[in-house]
């Protein structure tokens, strides 16, 4: 297994269809872990079996934690791989739901300079949230585990999720993007004054 043993959140998971169906013990590392501060390494062969295993580990961890995205450094693996999916229940704007997307060696290009500040949280900062400015529209591209290429132009929450996950590959956590740290705090405390959370 590619999941490393650290003292953070243990997740016991099985990912039928992406793996051999066996149980993997995996965890999501938290802010302060060195894997989250490093620039991740490019993947040389996206079709290699170890990348398929990594993706399976990531998918299981993301779904077990009920997240919408995960980057390989969040399970302490220094590879430029991100996954995300936004089901209809999590869509916050007129954009459609996003099916499971796997991007290896992703590249982002903003479309214009327009930015929007919105609420973000992260599986590596459990219980926390903050207001983060992000580009409103962008192009992204990346390679799939089958060796294909994904190219999309997206906006809204989809664009926010991609930017958040790709930041992890460069050692950036969302508080580092915030302009006003007074909007950063524990979700349960913020809910008392911001009911829309």
Give residue spans per PLM region.
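Positively charged
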Residues: 6-197
């Amino acid at each position: 297994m590619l999941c490393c043993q650290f003292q953070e959140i243990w997740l016991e998971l099985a990912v039928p269809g992406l793996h051999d169906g066996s149980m993997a013990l995996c965890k999501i590392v938290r802010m302060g872990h060195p894997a989250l501060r490093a620039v991740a390494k490019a993947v040389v062969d996206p079709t290699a079996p170890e990348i398929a295993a990594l993706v399976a580990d990531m998918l299981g961890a993301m779904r077990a934690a009920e997240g919408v995205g995960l980057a390989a450094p969040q399970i302490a693996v220094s590879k430029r791989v991100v996954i995300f999916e936004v089901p209809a229940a999590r869509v916050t704007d007129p954009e459609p739901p996003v099916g499971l997307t796997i991007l290896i060696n992703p590249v982002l290009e903003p479309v214009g300079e327009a930015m929007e500040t919105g609420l973000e949280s992260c599986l590596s900062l459990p219980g926390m949230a903050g207001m983060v400015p992000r580009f409103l529209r962008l192009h992204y591209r990346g390679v799939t585990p089958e060796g294909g290429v994904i190219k999309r132009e997206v906006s809204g929450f989809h664009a926010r999720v991609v930017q958040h996950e790709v930041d992890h590959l460069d050692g950036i956590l969302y508080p580092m993007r915030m302009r006003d740290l007074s909007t950063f705090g524990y979700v349960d405390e913020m809910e008392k004054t911001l009911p829309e959370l």
